C-alpha cells in the first residue's frame, strides 16, 4: 500500500466542498463528444476486457444516456489508498467524466479515516461523501443499524433506472460477503485481496535442503498443510539452516508492535485458521472467527460461558502459537514492527515462509532486481492456501479475504446517491474491471479471473491466479455478520493481544479479558436497542463444560495440539486444483 502526495488535489476538493460547488460549467458539457470519447477509451484504455469492443462501446453508451439527468454535477467519493483506488482516482474519474459529463472527486485517505468519515455521516446525518468504498467487514454493522442503503432494494426501486443491465451480480466473487443476514446485498464489491501462505519455492525445491529436512523431521519439505508442519519448517530454516549464500535466513516473519495493526493480525481470521469457530462459508455458524455466537441473527456472547469461543482453548492456542513463532523463529526486530514495517521484509530475500501474507504485496514482490525475483522476471516464491491448526475441520473458513465495497448512505440526497451509484458501477463494469484488475491485482469478477489475460500473466504472479481459480478460494472470506459493530469491537483486540506479546499477561488471561470486553459491548448494544431484531441479546452465563459438551464451538482442549506435520508438493497441489 503506497501513499501519494495528494495535498494539492485534496485542497482543491475541500475548497469545492466548503464552497458548496456541486456544478461544473454546463456549457463545457455541450462540447463533449461522449460517443467519440467512449470509442477512444475502449481502444486505448480499457483493453484487455472480457467483453468485445462492440459490447464495451454499448455498455459505455448506456452510461452516457443514463447519466443525462446528472450532467454537470460534481460528486464526492472516498476510499483507502490502494493501487486499485489510485487507478480509479487518477484515471477512471477522468474517463467517467468523458462519457457522462459528471465530475467525480475520488479522495484517497487511510482506511481508519474512511471509517471515521462514514461514522461521522451516520451520526450527524450530514452528507460528507456521496459514496464510500468501505470494507465488507462492516456488513454486520451496516445490516443492523439502518444507516446504509440496502442495494437489493435500491436496485428495484429508486435506483432501478440507474442500474446497469450488464452489471451481472453473480459474476462478483465476493457478493456473498456483502449480503446481510436478511439476504439483502448492502455493498457492491470493488476490490479484493486475500491473506495466504507465502514461501520460497526455490529453497523448498533445493535437493540438499529437502534431504536435510526429511532426515530431521521424517517427512518431505513442502507446502505445510497443518500448523505442526509450519512450525517444523520455521524451526528448520531458523535453527538448522541458519544461513544461505552468506546471509542469515529465518523460517518465519510476522510483526508484534502494540499498534492498531496488531488487531487485524487477529481479526483477519487468525482464530479461524487455528479452528476456533464453527463450520460455515462464508463464516462459521453459530460461532464465527471472532468467537461470537449468534442465535438466529442475534449475537449472544463471546465468552465460553455464554457459548462463545473468544477465550476458548482453540483461541488461546492461536494466540500462543503466534507469540511462540514470533519470538523463536522470526528476525529479532519483528517483535517491534507494525504491519506496514514488516510487509516489505520477505522481498529482501531472507525469509523462507510467512503464514500470514496479504496478496496486496504481490506487485511489490515481482519488481526486477529483487533478491526474490529470477532474471527472467518470474518469482522465486509462491503463494498458496494457508495451513490450518489442530482445531480446524473441513467445512470451516480457512483464511481472510479483504473486500472493499461501494456503500451508499440513506443520508445522502437521492440525486447524488443515484449519480454516485453510476460511478460505482462504472468502475466495476466488465468494460473496465479486467484492466483495473491487471493494474491493482485485486480481482472481483470470476470472468476476469478466468480470462486469457490472467492466464498469460499467471507465471509472473506467483500463484495468485491459480489460487483465485481454485476451489479453495471460497474458504477465504472477510469478517461476517456475527459482528454487530465492527468499529467498537475491533478496537478491543490490539491492546489485549499486546499484553500477551509483552508477557504482561498469559495468552489465557488476555483472551479472557478480550471476551469479557466484547460481551460488555454486546450488552451495551442490547441495552440501547438500536439494532432491531438482529441486535445482541446476551445468553446467561453457564458452566463452560456445558458448552464444551455441545457440538461444535467452543471446542474443548485437545489432548494433542501438535500432531505430526503434513506437507504437499506445490506442483502437486496446483495439479489437483486443475483436475477438479
Model-derived segments and spans:
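Long, aromatic- and glycine/proline-rich binding clefts that accommodate carbohydrate-like moieties
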Residues: 60-62, 74, 379-388, 437-501, ...
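Hinge/lid segment of periplasmic solute-binding proteins
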Residues: 32-69, 136-196, 380-386, 557-580
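Extracytoplasmic "Venus flytrap"
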Residues: 52, 72-91, 193
Amino acid at each position: 500500500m503506497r501513499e501519494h502526495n495528494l495535498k494539492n488535489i485534496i485542497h482543491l476538493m475541500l475548497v469545492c466542498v466548503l464552497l458548496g460547488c456541486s456544478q461544473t460549467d454546463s456549457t463545457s458539457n455541450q462540447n463533449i463528444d461522449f460517443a467519440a470519447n467512449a470509442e477512444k477509451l475502449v481502444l486505448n484504455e480499457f483493453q484487455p476486457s472480457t467483453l468485445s469492443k462492440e459490447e464495451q462501446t454499448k455498455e459505455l453508451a448506456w452510461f452516457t444516456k443514463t447519466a443525462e439527468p446528472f450532467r454537470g454535477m460534481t460528486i464526492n467519493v472516498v476510499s483507502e489508498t490502494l493501487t486499485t483506488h489510485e487507478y480509479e482516482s487518477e484515471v477512471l474519474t477522468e474517463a467517467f467524466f468523458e462519457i457522462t459529463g459528471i465530475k467525480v472527486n475520488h479522495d484517497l485517505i487511510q482506511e481508519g479515516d474512511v471509517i471515521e468519515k462514514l461514522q461521522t455521516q451516520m451520526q450527524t446525518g450530514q452528507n460528507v461523501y456521496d459514496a464510500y468504498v468501505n470494507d465488507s467487514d462492516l456488513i454486520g454493522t451496516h445490516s443492523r443499524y439502518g444507516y446504509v442503503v440496502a442495494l437489493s432494494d435500491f436496485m428495484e426501486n429508486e435506483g432501478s433506472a440507474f442500474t446497469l443491465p450488464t452489471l451481472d451480480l453473480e459474476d462478483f466473487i465476493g457478493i456473498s460477503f456483502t449480503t446481510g443476514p436478511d439476504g439483502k446485498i448492502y455493498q457492491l464489491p470493488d476490490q479484493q485481496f486475500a491473506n495466504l501462505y507465502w514461501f520460497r519455492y526455490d529453497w523448498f525445491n533445493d535437493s540438499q535442503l529437502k534431504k536435510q529436512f526429511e532426515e530431521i523431521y521424517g517427512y518431505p519439505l513442502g507446502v505445510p498443510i497443518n500448523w505442526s508442519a509450519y512450525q517444523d519448517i520455521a524451526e528448520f530454516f531458523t535453527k538448522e539452516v541458519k544461513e544461505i549464500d552468506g546471509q542469515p535466513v529465518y523460517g518465519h516473519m510476522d510483526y508484534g508492535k502494540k499498534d492498531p495493526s496488531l488487531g487485524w493480525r487477529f481479526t483477519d481470521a487468525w482464530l479461524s485458521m487455528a479452528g476456533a469457530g464453527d463450520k460455515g462459508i462464508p463464516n462459521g455458524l453459530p460461532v464465527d472467527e471472532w468467537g461470537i455466537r449468534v442465535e438466529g441473527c442475534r449475537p449472544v456472547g463471546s465468552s465460553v460461558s455464554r457459548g462463545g469461543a473468544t477465550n476458548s482453548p482453540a483461541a488461546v492456542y492461536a494466540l500462543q502459537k503466534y507469540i511462540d513463532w514470533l519470538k523463536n523463529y522470526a528476525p529479532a526486530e519483528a517483535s517491534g514492527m507494525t504491519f506496514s514495517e514488516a510487509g516489505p521484509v520477505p522481498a529482501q530475500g531472507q525469509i523462507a515462509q510467512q503464514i500470514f501474507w496479504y496478496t496486496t504485496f504481490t506487485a511489490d514482490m515481482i519488481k526486477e532486481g529483487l533478491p526474490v525475483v529470477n532474471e527472467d522476471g518470474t518469482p522465486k516464491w509462491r503463494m498458496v492456501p494457508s495451513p490450518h491448526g489442530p482445531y480446524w475441520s473441513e467445512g470451516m473458513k480457512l483464511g481472510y479475504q479483504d473486500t472493499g465495497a461501494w456503500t451508499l448512505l440513506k443520508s445522502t440526497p437521492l440525486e447524488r446517491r443515484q449519480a454516485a451509484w453510476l460511478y460505482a458501477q462504472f468502475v466495476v463494469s466488465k468494460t473496465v474491471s479486467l484492466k483495473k484488475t491487471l493494474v491493482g491485482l485485486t480481482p472481483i469478477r470470476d470472468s476476469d479471473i478466468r480470462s486469457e489475460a490472467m492466464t498469460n500473466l499467471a507465471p509472473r504472479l506467483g500463484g495468485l491466479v491459480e489460487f483465485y481459480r481454485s476451489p479453495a478460494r471460497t474458504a477465504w472470506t472477510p469478517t461476517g455478520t456475527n459482528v454487530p459493530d465492527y468499529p467498537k469491537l475491533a478496537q478491543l483486540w490490539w491492546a489485549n493481544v499486546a499484553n500477551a506479546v509483552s508477557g504482561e499477561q498469559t495468552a489465557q488471561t488476555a483472551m479472557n479479558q478480550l471476551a469479557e470486553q466484547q460481551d460488555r459491548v454486546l450488552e451495551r448494544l442490547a441495552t440501547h436497542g438500536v439494532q432491531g431484531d438482529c441486535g445482541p441479546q446476551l445468553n446467561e452465563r453457564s458452566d463452560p463444560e456445558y458448552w464444551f459438551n455441545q457440538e461444535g464451538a467452543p471446542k474443548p482442549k485437545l489432548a494433542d495440539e501438535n500432531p505430526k506435520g503434513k506437507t504437499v508438493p506445490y506442483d502437486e497441489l496446483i495439479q489437483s486444483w486443475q483436475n477438479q
